[in-house]
From Swiss-Prot:
Protein name, per record: Crossover junction endodeoxyribonuclease RuvC
Assigned keywords, A-Z: Cytoplasm, DNA damage, DNA recombination, DNA repair, DNA-binding, Endonuclease, Hydrolase, Magnesium, Metal-binding, Nuclease
Example GO BP: DNA repair
Family of the protein in this entry: Belongs to the RuvC family.
Gene, per the UniProt record: ruvC
SUPFAM superfamilies for the chain: Ribonuclease H-like (SSF53098)
Binding site for Mg(2+) 2: 67
Binding site for Mg(2+) 1: 8, 139
Enzyme Commission no: 3.1.21.10
Amino acid sequence: MSIILGIDPGSRVTGYGVIRQTGRHLEYLGSGAIRTQVEDLPTRLKRIYAGVTEIITQFQPNMFAIEQVFMAKNADSALKLGQARGTAIVAAVNNDLPVFEYAARLVKQTVVGIGSADKVQVQEMVTRILKLSDKPQADAADALAIAITHAHSIQHSLHIANSVKMTETQEKMTALLKTRYSRGRFRLKI
């Protein structure tokens, strides 16, 4: 069982979403947004850090997933986003959480099936995947989508690991059978 905290970073609004993954089953635990007022950047970063720390304390996640920085046209906006993202990561690391990063395009591809999906499509699919009665706010939906992407990544990794183990087992069994057959210890019955 994993409890995954997904974060959609922003210097004014940072979305969060928390899900529990048990095998292939995903359960919604909570979501929302950390909103900062029109204040100086250091104060906003302090609020983001405190907010993420509070969410970690409340939900006790054991994994932290966050959106990677994308290239923005406005350098100032990109720097502020990077600082907000870094602040959230520090809150996770200070609480001993492993940090996983996902590109926005991969998140949309995983949740919607289209890497160029818009926010409305992401909201709709998050609502369906988690069987929610109401659509979450856009920032919260993006954060939940990041958490879902991480859950999918875990499931995919387990599948690959099991496939590798199965392949190794099959190879060992084949080698054993070939050895026994070549030494006459094993006879094929047709």
